[in-house]
């Protein structure tokens, strides 16, 4: 009896299945011709070119920037680890290697479930998923009605079969593996392998391959960065499926399942080491090639940036701005209190705590406890799961002895990690983000290539690039241009200017122009060298008068400065505005025998196949004669050895440069060079307000420049045998009574003195 019932039920189920299959096949046949003309051309896969990442590379090949709508790296079939190929097939389509694009049995089972239980189940093969993702999404919108859903499904079947007829199974799996979305902006298995495990897809271990295959079903829910427990369960399910399908032995599957889920990547893209530099290039690329090419075409951009120097520039500017901020502004109350914001203080977390920490890193910390008001002692701070003491020496710069005078429980403060232990912070020092701004730019003298660029304290805080966009008054940093014009007109380093009170007619209904020196004193007769080294204002104005303001403006234009400068005597003291890149580029002509190279940041741009679209080469402009340039270089060396920049002399390296300070200390500059590189530093507020009394170029900008140059010198292979400023053949050297060995253009040296040598001295 029971056997008969079972037979009848089985027969009825079989008839239903046969009916459903017949109906589906009939429906498919009926609509095939109706839809055929409306379907995409499958041959488009012959030239499979999905959206890929545009990459910016430093000189050493390090990636410094990426732009993409879909973060994808296209790879070949052989670059996909066999374990990953097997994991995908075992999980997504076990019959992949046998079917012709459709799995009729899965279609029937799915249809029956839908009809009899109302449960929707996935029946799509890998080929169907590929058809849907590559072609059909752009041809139709998803509809809620059954008829609309059936129409979409039939088109999907047709396209899947066409794909199977045209391409091999390895081709189809390659297309699929490069196309699928795998969470956090990563498309394709190569991008996912780097995202989750920081390695290429070809090097994935079975448990890593299973993790990636596990994500395909629901990337937003199954990402191990989102839910580690769920991701682990799903990974182990994939490993079990691989065992069931014969891709792993039971022992291999068990061993892989027992391994912890260890992630090596980052859930978000790491910040660029050169965000201002990268953004500058991004704007140029978008303007030249268009947004579509920038974000989808996978351009490969080889830049001029030196990654090591860029890191040094970041650190030097950060340290310098923090130093100035502490001495000028003091401690500012924390802007955030997590308790006041409604957070549970024990559970509050920040993204930065999830990343590794090294000594010197600046990280946020939450204040967990402070002593009573007015009582000295230590504060208790938390970083991640670690609670650490902040002793009095760690906040001594605030000039407060009680932590309660500085902050309260729940405040979020910045701290510097002084030492680390067991992968986490051990000792801390209180820090704060400076409100002052600055910029640093380094240019290769012989090519004009930009080696490092920092456009401000924080790109997150402000994307305004103070290295290229901020027009600021130059102060005394403009004086070398004036003195260069004077030397070209016959002046020499020993020409005399009288440093004395002066008054010039400024024009109708204008008060007379009466420049003063920084110290409000006058030295009487001084040499041009002395005037430049000590940055005396009156001699510079007199040199401008001798040259002629209009001629000085014309000279400035030869150095790359804007021609719109007004020809006033105050120009000698830097009243005109310029950008840091303009000033730094101008100075680079001095050590380069008078030739200024146009600054540039991109060497080559190639398409995804490596075809060169653009190649930039150095562009030279002869600013001044080589002999004049060398005399100025020798004079500017004196600024470092005896003048306003003597702090740099301790570097024991051939250096030259000039400080610059504007009235009321609104702008502080130092621009200097060695035989190979020119580096400019500017410090100030975005709004033109004083930095504070005494914040000159020597006090504010020079220490930043020195920090950077220390790191630069350490990178040089010739640091034990420094390069030299090589003189042209018509330069002669004369040792003066002062003991200085002075450089002269032959024929301009003082009469009756002996020429001591015709090669550059090792030092003055």
Locate predicted features.
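Non-catalytic structural connector segments
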Residues: 249-357, 516, 520
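A penicillin-recognizing enzyme superfamily signal
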Residues: 303, 307-319, 342-360, 364-442, ...
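Conserved catalytic neighborhood of penicillin-recognizing serine enzymes
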Residues: 116-140, 202, 269-270, 446, ...
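Active-site SXXK
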Residues: 88, 242, 313, 447-448, ...
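Short, well-structured active-site flanking segments
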Residues: 97-107, 187-190, 249-252, 426, ...
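N-terminal type II signal-anchor transmembrane helix
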Residues: 1-57, 95, 115, 324
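Mid-domain, small-residue-enriched loop/turn segments at the edges of structured enzyme/sensor domains
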Residues: 510-517, 548-585, 601
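Peptidoglycan glycan-strand catalytic modules in the bacterial/periplasmic cell-wall system
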Residues: 2-3, 7, 51-53, 57-249, ...
């Amino acid at each position: 009896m029971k056997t008969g019932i079972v037979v009848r039920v089985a027969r009825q189920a079989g008839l239903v299945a046969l009916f459903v299959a017949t109906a589906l096949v009939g429906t498919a046949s009926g609509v095939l011709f109706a839809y055929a003309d409306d379907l995409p051309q499958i041959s488009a896969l012959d030239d499979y070119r999905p959206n890929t990442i545009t990459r910016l590379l430093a000189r050493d090949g390090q990636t410094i920037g990426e732009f993409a709508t879909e973060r994808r790296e296209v790879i070949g079939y052989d670059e996909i680890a066999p374990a990953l190929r097997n994991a995908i097939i075992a999980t997504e389509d076990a019959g992949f290697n046998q079917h012709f694009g459709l799995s009729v049995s899965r279609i029937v089972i799915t249809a029956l479930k839908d009809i009899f239980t109302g449960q929707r189940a996935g029946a799509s093969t890998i080929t169907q998923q590929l058809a849907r993702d590559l072609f059909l999404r752009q041809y139709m919108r998803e509809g809620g009605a059954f008829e609309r859903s059936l129409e979409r499904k039939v088109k999907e079947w047709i396209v899947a079969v066409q794909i199977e007829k045209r391409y091999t199974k390895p081709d189809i799996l390659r297309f699929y593996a490069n196309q699928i979305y795998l969470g956090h902006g990563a498309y394709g298995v190569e991008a996912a392998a780097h995202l989750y495990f920081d390695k290429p897809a070809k090097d994935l271990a079975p448990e890593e391959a299973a993790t990636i295959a596990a994500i395909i079903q629901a990337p937003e829910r199954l990402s191990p960065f989102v839910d580690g427990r769920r991701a682990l369960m799903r990974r182990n399910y994939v490993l079990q499926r691989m065992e069931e399908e014969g891709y792993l032995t039971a022992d291999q599957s068990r061993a892989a399942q027992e391994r912890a889920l260890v992630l090596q990547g980052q859930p978000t893209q790491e910040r660029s080491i050169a965000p201002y530099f990268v953004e500058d290039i991004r704007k140029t690329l978008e303007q030249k090639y268009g947004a579509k090419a920038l974000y989808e075409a996978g351009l490969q951009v080889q830049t001029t940036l030196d990654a090591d120097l860029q890191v040094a520039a970041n650190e030097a500017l950060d340290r310098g701005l923090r130093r100035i901020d502490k001495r000028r502004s003091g401690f500012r109350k924390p802007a955030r209190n997590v308790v006041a914001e409604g957070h549970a203080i024990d559970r509050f977390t920040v993204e930065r705590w999830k990343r590794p920490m090294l000594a010197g890193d600046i990280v946020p910390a939450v204040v967990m406890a402070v002593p009573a008001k007015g009582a000295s002692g230590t504060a208790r701070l938390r970083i991640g799961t670690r609670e650490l003491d902040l002793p009095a020496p760690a906040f001594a710069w605030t000039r407060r002895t009680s932590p309660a005078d500085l902050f309260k429980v729940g405040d979020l403060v910045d701290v510097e990690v002084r030492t680390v232990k067991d992968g986490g912070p051990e000792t801390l020092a209180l820090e704060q983000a400076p409100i002052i701004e600055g910029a640093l730019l380094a240019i290769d003298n012989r090519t004009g290539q930009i080696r490092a660029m920092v456009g401000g304290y924080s790109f997150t805080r402000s994307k305004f690039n103070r290295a290229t966009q901020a027009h600021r008054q130059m102060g005394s940093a403009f004086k070398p241009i004036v003195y260069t014009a004077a030397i070209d007109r016959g002046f020499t380093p020993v020409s005399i200017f009288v440093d004395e009170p002066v008054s010039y007619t400024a024009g109708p209904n204008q008060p007379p122009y009466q420049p003063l020196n920084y110290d409000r004193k006058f030295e009487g007769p001084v040499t041009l060298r002395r005037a430049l080294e000590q940055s005396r204002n009156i001699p510079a104005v007199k040199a401008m008068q001798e040259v002629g303001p209009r001629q000085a403006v014309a000279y400035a234009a030869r150095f790359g400065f804007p021609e719109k400068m007004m020809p006033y005597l105050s120009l000698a003291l830097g009243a005109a505005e310029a950008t840091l890149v303009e000033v730094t580029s101008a100075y680079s002509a001095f050590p380069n025998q008078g030739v200024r190279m146009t600054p540039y940041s991109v060497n080559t741009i190639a398409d995804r196949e490596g075809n060169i679209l653009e190649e930039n080469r150095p562009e030279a402009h002869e600013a001044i004669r080589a002999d004049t340039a060398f005399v100025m270089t020798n004079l500017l060396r004196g600024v470092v050895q005896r003048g306003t920049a003597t702090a740099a002399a301790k570097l024991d390296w051939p250096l030259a440069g000039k400080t610059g300070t504007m009235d009321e200390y609104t702008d502080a500059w130092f621009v200097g060079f060695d035989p190979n590189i020119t580096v400019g530093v500017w410090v100030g507020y975005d709004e033109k307000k004083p930095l504070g009394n005494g914040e000159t170029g020597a006090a504010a900008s020079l220490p930043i420049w020195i920090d950077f140059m220390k790191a630069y010198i350490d990178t040089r292979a010739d640091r034990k045998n420094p390069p030299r400023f090589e003189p042209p053949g018509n330069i002669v050297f004369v040792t003066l009574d002062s003991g200085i060995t002075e450089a002269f253009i032959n024929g301009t040296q003082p009469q009756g003195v002996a020429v001591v040598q015709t090669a550059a001295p090792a030092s003055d």
